[in-house]
Amino acid sequence: EINKSLDGILSQEGIHIRQWYVCPHARKDRCQCIKPNPAFLIQAARDYDLDLRHSFVIGDHPHDVLTGEAVGAFGLYLLTGHGPKHLDELPQDNLIFHTLGDAAGWILKHPNAERDITCDIQLGAEAIRRGGLVAFPTETVYGLGADVFNTDAVARIFEVKKRPLHNPLIVHVSEQRQVKPLVTNISKTAQKLMERFWPGPLTLVLPKADIVPDIVTAGNPTVAVRMPANQWARELITLSQTPLAAPSANAFGRTSPTTARHVEDQLHGGYDVLIDGGACRVGIESTVLSLAGGMPLLLRPGGVNQEEIVEITKAIEIFHPQNKTGKRFESPGMMLSHYAPTTPLRLVDDVAPYANRSDVGVILFQNSAICFQSPASVLSPGGDLREAAANLYRVMRKLDAMGLSLIVAQRAPDNGLGAAINDRLNKAAVKSPPNCQNRA
């Protein structure tokens, strides 16, 4: 039955199975998962005269992917089955996908695998140097990037996204040394945070140097900087020979994109090059921390937990959007309303009253004993915050496309990544009209 299901999924994408191999398995190391033996790959290569260097291995355990790569194949990782549980064991440069269909679709578009990705990155870098816009993957969400020093290109980002000019952009670098020309000072605390969390989902707001155009910083005396963990993003920045100013690659205020298809659906070609790097590993935006004043100020929760930051800073203040005065923002993600689907959304503690509403979509944090007649999607069956964060925007988009009258989301535990999940859902719910929020 499993093989039949896989056959059907792959056939829909245009990939047809010629033969199934029985794969020898063995239990190893700390994990109770059953691991394949590479012998079946070598046997398949002999039977069909395959060059494994031009072949693909798709699996939901790091062992699957690394086994394939060990014999020369290109590995694709699925966030199904054991996938979420073992994601931390997977090297950062491996591509990940939410479904087998997504992985199959990527293979058909990139038959030469790494060579095709390299070509896309080179085309992207050439576009950046010409003053163009490139949509590219990071570990958080897909970004829409331009040369930070090209004001015309940066202005086009605001135009394509319909983004207000008072909302600044994050500058992305591929090496720490690229930060120094952008700022007037790097404090000891900033240096420690960079060493601990970079490359990774932490943005630091620092005093800006005059070389950074005001359009990037919305006229603020500070600049937001981060180094993405995604290998392809850093390679794009390096080949572009400039830091990139890059917000999320979506229409302003709407749900952020975590796959290339999400970018296509929202921006409709408002870019010169789109680099398809699979699904985003973290799935929500970076944490933003301002070090421009006295006490470190958390402007936006994100991929790095507040608890982890405090281990270095010792103390921290929290920004609350409702206390904001004036129109200027020090970084992205500070507005009251953001990340919203087109369908009204409400954040609740108890989703049970909506269980029998066919016109209401339900976002569950984890598996529930309630039997839902309404469309329901689970962020993490086992209640894992990391898995829930990675699925959040995908699930929001899925329910948003169903023509529902309302989406209700179950609040996550407010610790670790849960704070970032609830922040996104709270902001996505702000624009929901009162009559939608109060229906039950």
Tell where the protein language model's regions lie, with residue ranges.
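Asp-based, Mg2+/Mn2+-dependent phosphohydrolase catalytic module
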Residues: K4-Q19, A26-V57, H61-A113
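A structural preference for short, hydrophobic beta-strand core positions in alpha/beta folds
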Residues: W20-V22, Y77, L347, V378
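Conserved residues at the C-terminal ends of beta-strands
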Residues: C23-P24, I58, L79, T99, ...
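Active-site-adjacent structural elements in enzyme catalytic cores
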Residues: N112-A440
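Short low-complexity, flexible loop/linker segments enriched in glycine and/or proline
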Residues: E1, P91-N94, A260-H262, R424
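Hydrophobic alpha-helical segments with strong N-terminal bias
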Residues: I9, Y21, G326-R328
